[in-house]
Amino acid sequence: MQTTVNKSNMLFCDYYKQWISVYKEGAIRPVTMNKYNMAHNWLIKLIPDLIISDLDRITYQKLLNDYAAEHERQTTMDFHHHLKCAILDAVDEGLILHDPTRKAIIKGKPYNGSVVKTKI
Protein backbone atom coordinates (compact mmCIF):
# COMPACT_ATOMS: atom_id res chain seq x y z
CA MET A 1 0.00 0.00 0.00
CA GLN A 2 1.44 3.31 -1.08
CA THR A 3 0.62 6.53 0.73
CA THR A 4 1.59 10.06 -0.12
CA VAL A 5 4.03 11.51 2.40
CA ASN A 6 2.92 15.13 2.13
CA LYS A 7 -0.66 15.16 0.88
CA SER A 8 -1.14 18.86 1.70
CA ASN A 9 1.00 19.73 -1.36
CA MET A 10 -0.96 17.34 -3.58
CA LEU A 11 -2.98 18.69 -6.49
CA PHE A 12 -6.69 18.61 -5.72
CA CYS A 13 -7.47 16.80 -8.99
CA ASP A 14 -4.92 14.09 -8.04
CA TYR A 15 -6.39 13.77 -4.54
CA TYR A 16 -9.87 13.46 -6.03
CA LYS A 17 -8.73 10.74 -8.47
CA GLN A 18 -7.09 8.83 -5.60
CA TRP A 19 -10.22 9.27 -3.48
CA ILE A 20 -12.38 7.81 -6.28
CA SER A 21 -10.02 4.85 -6.58
CA VAL A 22 -10.03 4.12 -2.84
CA TYR A 23 -13.65 4.80 -1.91
CA LYS A 24 -15.74 4.37 -5.06
CA GLU A 25 -14.18 1.76 -7.37
CA GLY A 26 -16.05 -1.50 -6.96
CA ALA A 27 -18.62 0.07 -4.64
CA ILE A 28 -20.83 1.90 -7.13
CA ARG A 29 -22.49 1.15 -10.46
CA PRO A 30 -20.52 1.83 -13.64
CA VAL A 31 -22.89 4.65 -14.67
CA THR A 32 -22.24 6.40 -11.35
CA MET A 33 -18.50 5.78 -11.66
CA ASN A 34 -18.61 7.51 -15.04
CA LYS A 35 -20.08 10.60 -13.35
CA TYR A 36 -17.25 10.69 -10.80
CA ASN A 37 -14.71 10.32 -13.61
CA MET A 38 -16.39 13.12 -15.59
CA ALA A 39 -16.16 15.34 -12.49
CA HIS A 40 -12.45 14.52 -12.34
CA ASN A 41 -12.03 15.48 -15.99
CA TRP A 42 -13.70 18.82 -15.28
CA LEU A 43 -11.31 19.41 -12.37
CA ILE A 44 -8.39 18.86 -14.73
CA LYS A 45 -9.94 21.35 -17.17
CA LEU A 46 -10.93 24.04 -14.63
CA ILE A 47 -8.38 23.83 -11.79
CA PRO A 48 -5.45 21.66 -12.96
CA ASP A 49 -2.85 23.35 -10.75
CA LEU A 50 -4.81 23.85 -7.52
CA ILE A 51 -3.01 22.51 -4.45
CA ILE A 52 -5.46 20.84 -2.08
CA SER A 53 -4.43 22.97 0.90
CA ASP A 54 -5.25 26.10 -1.15
CA LEU A 55 -8.89 25.09 -1.65
CA ASP A 56 -10.97 27.70 0.19
CA ARG A 57 -14.57 28.94 -0.11
CA ILE A 58 -13.82 31.57 -2.75
CA THR A 59 -11.79 29.18 -4.91
CA TYR A 60 -14.49 26.52 -4.60
CA GLN A 61 -17.26 29.00 -5.47
CA LYS A 62 -15.29 30.16 -8.53
CA LEU A 63 -14.92 26.50 -9.57
CA LEU A 64 -18.68 25.98 -9.28
CA ASN A 65 -19.37 29.21 -11.16
CA ASP A 66 -17.04 28.21 -14.00
CA TYR A 67 -18.69 24.79 -14.21
CA ALA A 68 -22.18 26.35 -14.05
CA ALA A 69 -21.38 28.60 -17.02
CA GLU A 70 -21.64 25.51 -19.25
CA HIS A 71 -24.18 23.39 -17.35
CA GLU A 72 -27.72 23.47 -16.03
CA ARG A 73 -28.29 24.07 -12.33
CA GLN A 74 -29.14 20.44 -11.53
CA THR A 75 -25.99 19.22 -13.27
CA THR A 76 -23.97 21.75 -11.28
CA MET A 77 -25.64 20.49 -8.09
CA ASP A 78 -24.62 16.92 -8.99
CA PHE A 79 -21.03 18.07 -9.64
CA HIS A 80 -21.01 19.82 -6.25
CA HIS A 81 -22.24 16.67 -4.47
CA HIS A 82 -19.61 14.49 -6.14
CA LEU A 83 -16.84 16.86 -5.06
CA LYS A 84 -18.19 17.54 -1.59
CA CYS A 85 -17.80 13.93 -0.43
CA ALA A 86 -14.07 13.97 -1.21
CA ILE A 87 -13.59 17.49 0.16
CA LEU A 88 -15.17 16.60 3.51
CA ASP A 89 -12.79 13.65 3.78
CA ALA A 90 -9.88 16.01 3.06
CA VAL A 91 -11.12 18.29 5.85
CA ASP A 92 -11.30 15.28 8.20
CA GLU A 93 -7.72 14.38 7.24
CA GLY A 94 -6.55 17.93 8.02
CA LEU A 95 -5.56 18.65 4.42
CA ILE A 96 -8.05 21.53 4.23
CA LEU A 97 -8.63 23.64 7.34
CA HIS A 98 -12.28 24.58 6.79
CA ASP A 99 -15.08 23.15 4.68
CA PRO A 100 -15.02 25.19 1.45
CA THR A 101 -18.36 23.71 0.35
CA ARG A 102 -20.20 25.38 3.24
CA LYS A 103 -22.75 27.91 1.98
CA ALA A 104 -21.84 27.26 -1.66
CA ILE A 105 -24.23 28.89 -4.12
CA ILE A 106 -25.30 26.57 -6.92
CA LYS A 107 -25.83 28.36 -10.22
CA GLY A 108 -26.34 27.13 -13.74
CA LYS A 109 -28.16 27.59 -16.98
CA PRO A 110 -31.94 27.34 -16.78
CA TYR A 111 -33.48 23.97 -17.58
CA ASN A 112 -34.15 23.92 -21.30
CA GLY A 113 -36.72 21.13 -21.19
CA SER A 114 -35.18 19.20 -24.04
CA VAL A 115 -35.57 15.62 -22.93
CA VAL A 116 -35.14 13.08 -25.68
CA LYS A 117 -37.89 10.46 -25.56
CA THR A 118 -37.75 7.25 -27.51
CA LYS A 119 -40.62 4.95 -28.35
CA ILE A 120 -40.36 1.33 -27.39
Give the residues covered by each predicted segment.
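N-terminal compositionally biased, intrinsically disordered segments and leader/signal-like regions
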Residues: T4-V5, K119
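Secondary-structure junction/capping motif
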Residues: L11-Y15, D99-R102
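N-terminal core-binding DNA-recognition domain of tyrosine site-specific recombinases/integrases
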Residues: V5-N9, C13, I20-L88, D92-L95
